[in-house]
Amino acid sequence: MSLAVTEVTHNHPEGIKGAEATAVCVFLARQGKSKDEIKAHVSEHYYPLDFTLDEIRPTYDFDVPCQGSVPQALEAFFESTSFEDAIRNAISIGGDSDTIGAICGAVAEAFYGAPKEIRSKALTFLPQHLVDVLKRVETVFCQEQEGES
């Protein structure tokens, strides 16, 4: 199923691989898998995650291909302790920060939930029709998560 979803916006094999890895991480997080289990799956099927953020931070730069941003975004999640910490990790490495933050944030939200105040504020930036779409998707596909306090 993740291939069908990713092919809508990604038509290069590496792009599909990166989007699929992200979708699988979100799925596994929503299934209650641990970070270690999710990381092992990514390492086995998608990317070697044999680095830390501290190791790459001094030299990491903007890297457009998925293999230069998806593993880094996922590592930002794996090294986090909360939703907000995950986003801070993602931004801290530099590079394509909006992409890395979006990838990391998707997995972090599935794993931790988003704090209510962050979610509420973020929704104010969306047009109402997109808020309605989000609510319909969540009703069909997502268990409600309380989010962090």
Regions inferred by a protein language model and the residue ranges of each:
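Catalytic phosphate/nucleotide-handling subdomain of diverse soluble enzymes
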Residues: 2-10, 21-27, 68, 73-147
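Solvent-exposed loop and edge beta-strand segments that line ligand/cofactor-binding
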Residues: 10-15, 59-63, 96
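Compositionally biased, intrinsically disordered low-complexity regions
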Residues: 49-52, 115, 149
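Histidine (H) residue identity feature
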Residues: 10-12, 41, 45, 129
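Small-residue-rich helix-loop
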Residues: 19-23, 30, 34-63
